[in-house]
Amino acid sequence: MPTTSRPALDVKGGTSPAKEDANQEMSSVAYSNLAVKDRKAVAILHYPGVASNGTKASGAPTSSSGSPIGSPTTTPPTKPPSFNLHPAPHLLASMHLQKLNSQYQGMAAATPGQPGEAGPLQNWDFGAQAGGAESLSPSAGAQSPAIIDSDPVDEEVLMSLVVELGLDRANELPELWLGQNEFDFTADFPSSC
């Protein structure tokens, strides 16, 4: 597909007539079977931010003041978020857990009836709730495992979560020591008091 260039903008934001004529000529070569109106539409489709006269086109209907109808002021265009190929380290553990969880769900669905294993498809009776109509049916309870603690977890995943949560530094933080009293009066005050 042939490409066309944008009309050159002069210092004031408009297009210079010579550059616009050259652009229309190039556009007419690229799209020789289109009418002038169609060529302008193609140019607008290729470059939706600039109208055929060089002014900014928003695509929204405008009022007589030039601002789009329904908005008090025009906002500058926002930059699309960039795609990061290297996610932050604290997200890696969560992504790994999601991957393992989806793999585990696939395995559990494929082998529901192994002897000696409690499997995720147990029918738990939660009892009748208020109103009776909202009680959980056995088929709805069978869709998800009821006990989270019965899922096997990889040691590598656990260690990555420990690092992610900062629990590996528990020895460095005295306020996290278990059994430590908040106030140690014998060390804070002299024995003569």
Swiss-Prot record:
The keyword Lipid metabolism belongs to this UniProt entry's keyword annotation: no
Source organism of the structure: Homo sapiens (Human)
Stimuli inducing this protein: Up-regulated by GPR39 in neuronal cells.
Family: Belongs to the CITED family.
Keyword Cytoplasm: yes
Signal peptide feature range: none
Record's comment on post-translational modification: Phosphorylated. Phosphorylation changes in a cell cycle-dependent manner and reduces its transcriptional coactivator activity.
Taxonomic lineage of the native organism: Eukaryota, Metazoa, Chordata, Craniata, Vertebrata
Protein name, UniProt field: Cbp/p300-interacting transactivator 1
GO biological process: apoptotic process; brain development; branching involved in ureteric bud morphogenesis; labyrinthine layer development; melanin biosynthetic process; melanocyte differentiation; mesenchymal to epithelial transition; metanephros development
